[in-house]
Amino acid sequence: MKFVILLTIGLLVVAAIPQRRQQQQQQQQQQQRDEREIPPFLEGAPPSVIDEFYNLLKTDENKTDQQTEADVEAFINRLGGSYKVRFTQFMEEVKKARADYERIHQQAVARFSPAAKDADARMSAIADSPHLTTRQKSQQIQAIMDSLSESVRREIINALSPQE
């Protein structure tokens, strides 16, 4: 009799393991969603829309900036309504932020050592290339940063880090 009870308990535990794993996976996925920063133009969007947006960005790592921008615009146009209005506002803010960054960047470059200026010029050419994918840009810029001496790397990072 004890054997039957132990066997039954064992079978129940074994049957519950896959269900428990599935619950843990669902909790992990929800945590990842909660930890992601939601772009302002998708505030209030259903989780499925936010997931779709992040999946789009992930697959677009192998596309050029122009291709990614076209994919994002098509995604936003498909959503329409207030998402489109908020996206337009967001892009205006991005344009201003880019102008501010470029001003700060130029001021920093003016103070760079010759080695930092050279590295910055190479990285800027990569970042501005319309022919490279996001992944290629990231890898090539990282390779340049990794090849720099510690002092030059710190010089660039400190100069371009937001000042508080």
Curated annotation (Swiss-Prot):
Keywords: Signal. Residues 1-16 form the signal peptide. Residues 24-43 are annotated as: Disordered. High levels in the hypodermal layer of the adult female. It comes from the Eukaryota. Disulfide bonds: none annotated. Pfam families: ANIS5_cation-bd. Belongs to the SXP/RAL-2 family. This is OV-17 antigen. It comes from Onchocerca volvulus.
